[in-house]
Design a protein with these regions (language model features):
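Anionic group-binding determinants
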Residues: 1-203
Length: 203
């Protein structure tokens, strides 16, 4: 990316499940961080969802073809497919997904009038939204639905960059302190089912 994210990340790793179209994103400070992220993703898929990862397709970049990753794939019986250099069509699923996420994320940043350093938050939110949109390739089911077996709720979804107020716990404020702090909505936490908020007052 042209600028570092708020958390100091420089790269976006996007993993796309060929079967469902479900995406998983990671913001990375260095390219070699992708190794642990890929391992973490594969182990989560195989243990939490009881799915067998059969193959991994990538463009042959050094960080994706490292020996530790090759050994990891071999141990799990995962086939490694390397696409043809400079032939983007051979990795069309990933190329289209990246283009889609960047387009959505860029639009959200523009609409919210936020600096480009919020790109990681915008990208993760775009992925979260895309996973919950019906896909014509999957009989109008959402990728989330295909993976989890039930329809996702969208009642909790908010406009990226909108103004928010976060309640400050009584234990962390005095009688005369404001009850809430102002912030900007910057996404969702999938594990804890919470919102991500940028604290304006901390600047």
């Amino acid at each position: 990316m042209e600028v570092d994210s708020l958390g100091g990340s420089k790269y976006l790793l996007l993993i796309v499940d060929e079967g469902s179209g479900c995406m998983k994103g990671f913001s990375l400070r260095a390219k070699y961080d992708s190794e642990e992220c890929i391992k973490k993703y594969i182990m989560a898929v195989q243990t939490q969802f009881d799915y067998k990862v059969k193959f991994v397709r990538h463009d042959g970049a050094r960080e994706f073809a490292a020996n530790p990753l090759k050994a990891f794939y071999d141990d799990l019986g995962i086939e490694q497919q390397v696409t043809v250099p400079y032939a983007h069509k051979t990795n069309g699923t990933a190329e289209r997904a990246i283009r889609t996420i960047v387009t959505i994320g860029r639009s959200m940043l523009h609409y919210a009038k936020l600096d480009r350093c919020f790109w990681a938050e915008a990208a993760m939110t775009a992925i979260y939204i895309k996973n919950r949109l019906p896909s014509p390739k999957c009989q109008d089911q959402t990728p989330f639905e295909i993976v989890n077996g039930f329809r996702p709720s969208v009642k909790h979804m908010r406009v990226f960059g909108c103004r928010t107020f976060v309640l400050t716990p009584k234990e962390r404020r005095s009688k005369w302190d404001p009850k809430a702090r102002e912030g900007l909505f910057t996404g969702y936490e999938e594990v804890s089912k919470a919102y991500r908020v940028y604290d304006i007052e901390a600047d």
